[in-house]
Regions:
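A cross-family acyltransferase "interaction/gating" segment
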Residues: 59-122
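Membrane-interfacial terminal anchoring regions of lipid-handling membrane enzymes
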Residues: 42-44, 126-150
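Short, structured patches in soluble enzyme cores that scaffold and shape functional sites
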Residues: 19, 53-55, 112
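Active-site and donor-binding regions of nucleotide-sugar-utilizing enzymes
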Residues: 22-24, 30-36, 86
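Catalytic core of membrane glycerolipid acyltransferases/transacylases, capturing the structured
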Residues: 1-29, 74
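Hydrophobic, well-ordered secondary-structure segments
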Residues: 8, 19, 32-43, 66, ...
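Catalytic-site beta-strand/loop segments enriched in glycine and acidic/polar residues
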Residues: 35-70, 74
């Protein structure tokens, strides 16, 4: 996370920091609630936010509830997005963090918006979380095929 945060800061991208699931990490609250409030304010102001759907300590590629809760509270849809490049290095970290390198082919692909009703039940939240996870994993497979074509 620090590598991305430092890179984005140098590119003058506004960052909102906060841990998504402190109980899973065995730690106390690490700014997740404040980050959620900040993102809701930004969305209600007509702007967009982005973040990864999986949460430390993993496993990677499994969506947490963060995006679903944000969509429920903000009234904004989730747009699943996957991006990759043909020239990349994959780390052996829990999330298989990937550093995209120059001089390769790149692609970005997005899926259908996912709407979460403000009165969504726990069961509906879990269904939307599964929908997001499946969509992101399918998009990742598709975008990798795009850059691997000769």
């Amino acid at each position: 996370g620090e590598l991305i945060a430092n890179t984005l800061s140098r590119l003058q991208v506004k960052l909102i920091r906060g841990a998504g699931n402190p109980d899973k990490l065995g730690i106390k609250e690490k700014g997740g609630k404040a980050a959620l409030r900040s993102m809701i304010k930004i969305l209600k102001g007509g702007n967009s936010v982005s973040f990864t759907a999986d949460q430390p300590p993993g496993p990677g590629r499994l969506a947490g509830n963060g995006a679903i809760i944000l969509a429920k509270l903000s009234g904004c849809p989730i747009v699943p997005v996957a991006a990759t490049t043909s020239n990349r290095y994959e780390f052996t970290s829990w999330d298989k963090f990937t550093m995209h390198l120059p001089f390769g082919k790149g692609a970005v692909i997005w899926g259908d918006p996912i709407f979460v009703p403000s009165n969504a039940t726990k069961e509906e939240i879990e269904n939307k979380r599964n929908l997001l996870e499946n969509s992101l994993n399918e998009l990742t497979i598709k975008v990798n095929k795009v850059v691997e074509k000769k």
